[in-house]
Amino acid sequence: MILILLISFYGVCNARNIRTTSYHVTIHKKAGNHKKLKIILLADLHLGYNIGCSQMKQMVMKVNQQSPDLIVVAGDIFDNEYDALDDPDQLVKIFRQLKSQYGVYAVYGNHDIDEKILAGFTFGSGREKKVSDPRMDEFVKRAGMKLLRDESVVLIKASISMEDQMLRK
């Protein structure tokens, strides 16, 4: 029992730490006149029970310091339940402070849709149609993110494409 409590405590504390990792990727394709494109990838935000306004303010500040060309939010924006957000309107204002030349694009992950999850893992047949909470959809829109659902977007004669397996019919 003590081990479980210690592991849970470690997980909660670790979730609040913002980690950055830099990668330099060479792609042998033309992207307009761009020689370099700085893309910031945010993943597994899990807004709600453990992550709120304070952590997001720090994250937005770190992202904006990098002067990205593009910001991509790669799923698990929410921690399963919209009602877990401590102050949705304030979080929207914080997200709207993200700055990039080509905008902020997002896809949903398994924690952003109506799916059976136990201890962070998805279970079930996988055959059911996955739907998102309309309040989450509205939050993402108000936050200034373009939600991609099995679609691609052309940026500077280069394209970004993100498949959303969770919402595929």
Describe these PLM feature segments:
Residues 15-30:
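Alpha-helical transmembrane signal-anchor/signal-peptide segments
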